[in-house]
């Protein structure tokens, strides 16, 4: 029987949004490649996911994903604004975009936590300021017919 316990872990460091694929030329032929910053971040995501899975089998059915994206507070913020940011009363309207971080997390977990990110049928995603930057990830396997 499949292990239906949720998997929870944190991807440390400043969150990075998924970069657009770039096109370069190799021996006269166009070649697409993922930007190095994106590839490095997806590697960190995969490593964090592997540690959390601890040898468990990949989820094969539908999953719910919860992402809590914490961005560092800019040094230029006043003490008053920093306190508001940490209290959740000031929201980060700066890069990286929430959806691009979400894409990077999903792609980094392909073949690590689930077979493919098409299995994500429900997501709860938020972006906030935090003392420690990073992304808290929770993946919950769903049973067929479960909402």
Question: What are the residue ranges of the model-derived segments?
Answer:
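Acidic, proline/glycine-enriched N-terminal capping motif
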Residues: 1-147
């Amino acid at each position: 029987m499949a292990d239906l316990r949720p998997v929870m872990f944190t991807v440390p460091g400043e969150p990075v949004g998924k970069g657009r694929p770039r096109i370069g030329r190799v021996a006269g032929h166009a070649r697409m490649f993922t930007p190095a910053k994106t590839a490095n971040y997806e590697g960190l995501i995969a490593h964090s996911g592997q540690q959390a899975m601890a040898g468990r089998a990949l989820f094969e059915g539908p999953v719910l994903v919860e992402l809590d994206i914490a961005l560092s507070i800019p040094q230029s913020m006043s003490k008053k604004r920093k306190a508001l940011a940490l209290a959740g009363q000031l929201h980060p309207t700066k890069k990286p975009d929430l959806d691009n971080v979400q894409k990077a997390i999903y792609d980094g977990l392909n073949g690590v936590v689930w077979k493919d990110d098409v299995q994500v049928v429900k997501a709860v995603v938020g972006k906030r300021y935090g003392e420690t930057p990073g992304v808290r990830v929770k993946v919950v396997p769903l049973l067929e017919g479960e909402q």
